[in-house]
């Protein structure tokens, strides 16, 4: 069957997005073809995303020079969380528990992929340390995330900054029998009195 070229073009564009395969892309394209108001709203949102760029201070997404978090005077500027990505920053923000500032590295150390310290936003991090009392290394619990945290801990301690790592353990609502050994071990190491 021959489809209109504009529908094919939209389907191809949608299928290049992460998590969207060809069938989902086609369903979305067909939906938009029959729901013009939603298509218009999406087009407007896509036009607006062109204004988004990296915050010059932390690497978060911003529509101006600084992101809303860096502009927020109520944030604790003595506390800095280092994350691998903007998605990680958003995950911490959703918790509502962290009131400091962030620094986005733009990845994790991965020598096999050619990602060393020079490929990450480390110089920006080191420039931001004035007035910072504690850096929380909130990198992933992967080999790369752990390597990045160890490297940064060494570098930051040389600069006289207190370095911490989030406690890792069991998820709320999770069953012990399904937890892996490493998670259980970390949960037991980080136990606290009740």
Swiss-Prot record:
Q: Which gene encodes it?
A: recR
According to the entry, what is the taxonomic lineage of the organism?
Bacteria, Thermotogati, Deinococcota, Deinococci, Thermales
Output the Pfam families linked to this UniProt entry.
RecR_C, RecR_HhH, RecR_ZnF, Toprim_4
Keywords attached to this Swiss-Prot or TrEMBL record, sorted alphabetically, are: DNA damage, DNA recombination, DNA repair, Metal-binding, Zinc, Zinc-finger
**What is its biological role?**
May play a role in DNA repair. It seems to be involved in an RecBC-independent recombinational process of DNA repair. It may act with RecF and RecO.
Q: Which domain of life is it from?
A: Bacteria
Give the family per the record: Belongs to the RecR family.
Per its UniProt record, what HAMAP family does this chain match?
RecR
Alphabetical list of SMART domains matching this protein: HhH1 (SM00278), TOPRIM (SM00493)
* NCBIfam families (alphabetical): recR
Quote the protein name from its UniProt record.
Answer: Recombination protein RecR
Q: Where are the zinc fingers (C4-type)?
A: 55-70
Annotated Toprim domain residues: 78-171
